[in-house]
Amino acid sequence: MNIILLGPPGAGKGTQASRLVENRGMVQLSTGDMLRAAVKAETPVGLKAKAIMESGGLVSDEIVSGIIGEALDALSPETGVIFDGYPRTQAQAHSLDDLLDARGRTLDHVIELAVDEDALVERITGRFTCAACGEGYHDSFKRPKADGVCDKCGGTEFKRRADDNEETVRTRMAEYRAKTAPILPIYEARGIVSRVDGMADMDDVSAAIAAILDR
C-alpha cells in the first residue's frame, strides 16, 4: 500500500506517519527528514536547501524528486510507503506518478490533515526540544515537569528550530494553499482522497486514518 499524507507543515503528518510505521510496518519517506539530514551533512544539496528552508520557501522539484526516487529504489516492491510532505506541487504529483509507475507501484490513498491556521501557528511556534536527547516539548501543551529540566534525560539546554516562527509558518501556509492544495483535484478525480481533522487529538486522528486504510 502506498499513501500520501497532505497538510501544511506542523499539521501532524510526521507523527501519524510514525504510527503507521510502527503499527503497519510501512516505511515513511519524509522529505523534511531527508532534507534535514542533507543539511546536517552539509552536502551540496543540503547547503542549497538550508537557505531555502529557513526562509520558508520550498526546495526545487528536481532536488526533492531525486531524493524520493533513490529512496524507493532502496525498498523491496512489497514494502508499503507513506509519503510525508510530498508531493507539494502539481509538478511533483506528476513526477510521483512517473516514479511509482516505473517501479510497478500504485497510489492507494491520499489523506489530507485539515488545520486552522491560527491554531497551527500556536502549535508550531511553541514547540522546542531537549538539545541533548531530542525529547519534544511545547510552551502551552507539554512543558517539562521541572522547569528547565528535560523529563527524559535531565538535560538543561533546549533548542527551537530556526524556521519555527510565525512569519515562516504563515508563509508556508500561503504556499501550501497556493501550490499544494491545487494537487487535490488530481487525486479527487481518482476517488482516493479523504480528509481528517488534523487539529483533533492525535489518537483520534490515528483512528480516523486507520478506518480509511481498512475500509
Where are the regions that the model predicts?
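Glycine-rich phosphate-binding loop of ATP-dependent small-molecule kinases
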Residues: M1-R215
